[in-house]
């Protein structure tokens, strides 16, 4: 495993740069302005977050047993746990960054089953306990880059997705892997109300090429900071693909299906000119409405300590994954 390059410090970001305009997409989808947070309110919410650690801590999850392989430990500065668990995109629980932490307590994660089906020789249905018993858990410190041009460094706990897929024995027809979030409108207000959920079509769906899913960096994740995932971070099981933008990291997964054809994905369905299927982190391919050349790293300090830094190709994992895309036009296949 090649060494991951260390993040660099840069200039402080101006307040006006913090608020990304992804909500404009939702307006284009027919969501009324009254249903969305006003820019000033959004700025105030973000500023209140960065004042310091004055928010109540997220409920503690169950402690997990896991190893810490040296290949996945590094000197990257971690984003504090309260920010990882309190600053989220999970539109099933609301559009503002604080909404998931405030509203996701309604999600029932026990019992939980995960179904693996499609182009496999051995379809599987596993409950959450079986998942964590069958596969040894390990902590991996990964960069996380949001398409909104902010980033974190997070100590995820999970196991390589390829281990689960190998258990199901993909057939020669399998070319893609489709993922689906639980559909539970009675528990997820954003699925119940199009204004709360941003007008997206639910359940949330995502997809990868099979070779991407089988890559050793791709993690099926059940914990963070030594404990089981809190609901707002995608409990009880979510996907982490560290070289892709965060919206590829589908949360609260109930179905993994191997397919012959490329599966639909939620944000690509909503705005195909803005959110591609691949969604590889690429500083040379801008979002139509903002640059992807730099990012704001969310670390331990307040707003005056927030660091702006260059975005790295494939989020710093180019040595490990660039070969997956040899010969592919990354501008066209964004």
Curated annotation (Swiss-Prot):
<feature type="binding site">
    <location>
        <position position="181"/>
    </location>
    <ligand>
        <name>Mo-molybdopterin</name>
    </ligand>
</feature>
<feature type="binding site">
    <location>
        <position position="88"/>
    </location>
    <ligand>
        <name>Mo-molybdopterin</name>
    </ligand>
</feature>
<feature type="binding site">
    <location>
        <position position="238"/>
    </location>
    <ligand>
        <name>Mo-molybdopterin</name>
    </ligand>
</feature>
<comment type="similarity">
    <text>Belongs to the MsrP family.</text>
</comment>
<feature type="binding site">
    <location>
        <position position="233"/>
    </location>
    <ligand>
        <name>Mo-molybdopterin</name>
    </ligand>
</feature>
<keyword id="KW-0479">Metal-binding</keyword>
<dbReference type="GO" id="GO:0043546">
    <property type="term" value="F:molybdopterin cofactor binding"/>
</dbReference>
<dbReference type="GO" id="GO:0016672">
    <property type="term" value="F:oxidoreductase activity, acting on a sulfur group of donors, quinone or similar compound as acceptor"/>
</dbReference>
<dbReference type="GO" id="GO:0042597">
    <property type="term" value="C:periplasmic space"/>
</dbReference>
<dbReference type="GO" id="GO:0046872">
    <property type="term" value="F:metal ion binding"/>
</dbReference>
<feature type="binding site">
    <location>
        <begin position="91"/>
        <end position="92"/>
    </location>
    <ligand>
        <name>Mo-molybdopterin</name>
    </ligand>
</feature>
<keyword id="KW-0560">Oxidoreductase</keyword>
<keyword id="KW-0732">Signal</keyword>
<feature type="binding site">
    <location>
        <position position="146"/>
    </location>
    <ligand>
        <name>Mo-molybdopterin</name>
    </ligand>
</feature>
<feature type="binding site">
    <location>
        <begin position="249"/>
        <end position="251"/>
    </location>
    <ligand>
        <name>Mo-molybdopterin</name>
    </ligand>
</feature>
<keyword id="KW-0500">Molybdenum</keyword>
<protein>
    <recommendedName>
        <fullName>Protein-methionine-sulfoxide reductase catalytic subunit MsrP</fullName>
        <ecNumber>1.8.5.-</ecNumber>
    </recommendedName>
</protein>
<dbReference type="InterPro" id="IPR022867">
    <property type="entry name" value="MsrP"/>
</dbReference>
<dbReference type="InterPro" id="IPR006311">
    <property type="entry name" value="TAT_signal"/>
</dbReference>
<dbReference type="InterPro" id="IPR036374">
    <property type="entry name" value="OxRdtase_Mopterin-bd_sf"/>
</dbReference>
<comment type="subunit">
    <text>Heterodimer of a catalytic subunit (MsrP) and a heme-binding subunit (MsrQ).</text>
</comment>
<feature type="signal peptide" description="Tat-type signal">
    <location>
        <begin position="1"/>
        <end position="44"/>
    </location>
</feature>
<keyword id="KW-0574">Periplasm</keyword>
<dbReference type="GO" id="GO:0030091">
    <property type="term" value="P:protein repair"/>
</dbReference>
<dbReference type="InterPro" id="IPR000572">
    <property type="entry name" value="OxRdtase_Mopterin-bd_dom"/>
</dbReference>
<dbReference type="Pfam" id="PF00174">
    <property type="entry name" value="Oxidored_molyb"/>
</dbReference>
<comment type="function">
    <text>Part of the MsrPQ system that repairs oxidized periplasmic proteins containing methionine sulfoxide residues (Met-O), using respiratory chain electrons. Thus protects these proteins from oxidative-stress damage caused by reactive species of oxygen and chlorine generated by the host defense mechanisms. MsrPQ is essential for the maintenance of envelope integrity under bleach stress, rescuing a wide series of structurally unrelated periplasmic proteins from methionine oxidation, including the primary periplasmic chaperone SurA and the lipoprotein Pal.</text>
</comment>
């Amino acid at each position: 495993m090649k060494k991951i390059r260390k993040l660099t410090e840069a200039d402080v970001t101006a307040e006006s740069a913090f608020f990304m305009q992804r909500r404009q997409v939702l307006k284009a989808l027919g969501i009324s302005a009254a249903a969305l947070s006003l820019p000033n309110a959004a700025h105030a919410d973000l500023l209140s977050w960065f004042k310091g650690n004055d928010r109540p801590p997220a409920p503690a999850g169950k402690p997990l047993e896991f190893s810490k392989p040296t290949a996945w430990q590094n000197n990257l500065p971690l984003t504090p746990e309260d920010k990882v668990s309190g600053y989220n995109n999970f539109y099933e629980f609301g559009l503002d960054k604080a909404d998931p932490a405030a509203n996701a307590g309604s999600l029932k994660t026990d019992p939980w089953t995960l179904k693996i089906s499609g182009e496999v020789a051995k379809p599987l249905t596993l409950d959450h306990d079986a998942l964590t018993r069958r596969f040894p858990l390990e902590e991996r410190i990964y960069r996380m880059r949001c398409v909104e041009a902010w980033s974190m460094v997070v100590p995820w706990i999970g196991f390589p997705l390829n281990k689960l897929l190998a258990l199901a024995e993909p057939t020669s027809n399998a070319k893609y892997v489709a993922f689906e979030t639980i559909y539970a409108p009675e528990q997820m207000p954003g699925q119940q109300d199009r204004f709360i959920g941003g007008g997206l079509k639910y359940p949330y769906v995502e997809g990868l090429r099979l070779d991407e899913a089988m890559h050793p960096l791709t993690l099926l994740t059940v914990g963070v900071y030594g404990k089981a995932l809190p609901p707002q971070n995608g409990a009880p099981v979510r996907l982490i693909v560290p070289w892709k933008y965060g919206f590829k990291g589908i949360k609260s997964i109930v179905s993994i299906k191997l397919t012959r054809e490329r599966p639909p994905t939620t944000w690509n369905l909503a705005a195909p000119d803005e959110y591609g299927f691949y969604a590889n982190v690429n500083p040379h391919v801008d979002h139509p409405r903002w640059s992807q050349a730099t990012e704001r790293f969310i670390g331990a300090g307040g707003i005056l300590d927030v660091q702006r830094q260059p975005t790295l190709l494939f989020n710093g994992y180019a040595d490990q994954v660039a070969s997956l895309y040899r010969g592919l036009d990354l501008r066209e296949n964004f």
